[in-house]
Amino acid sequence: LFLGSTCIYPREAPQPMPEDCLLTSPLEYSNEPYAIAKIAGIKMCESYNLQYGTNYIAVMPTNLYGPNDNFNLETSHVLPAMIRKIHLAKCLHTGDWEALRKDMDIRPVEGVSGKASEPEILSVLDKQGIRPGEVELWGTGKPLREFLWSEEMADASVYIMEHVDFEDVRQKEGEVRNTH
């Protein structure tokens, strides 16, 4: 099983993304090296399957989240950041400074831990768009995103490895363009 990434699709891919738009136009510049490596892996799997009769299947997980995720507001992906922002805003809104300080001791924000003064904590959270009863989400709001619980992806991966063969997804006529 080869795990690809949705970043392999073109920057301007239609939504929802059809599989056949792979390699049809430029990639998102900031993801390009990673995307090219993933595309190379997919193509390697296809080539090995065709040339050596192997049974490599490539799947493209969407945005995964789950246990042990990265909730650091400065380095996390979108969903863990949103979950944490909402949690911290709720703590502020309800005045639950104990829970807020505990959270910030585990994961300081911009170097500010739960041991800091209330004004310091409020200031750093405000810079992150976290206020009592209010959460500011960044970005344009235009990207469409899908999220999948990591344990469901794990279950699907096991199922695919046990029940899906390359020949099941291969088009019998013409070129193999992608097999995910």
For each of these PLM feature ranges, what is it?
Residues S5, P61-L64:
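Active-site loop/turn elements of alpha/beta-hydrolase fold enzymes
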Residues P26, E136-P143:
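Catalytic Tyr-x(3-8)-Lys segment
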Residues Y52-A58:
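Conserved Rossmann-fold SDR core element
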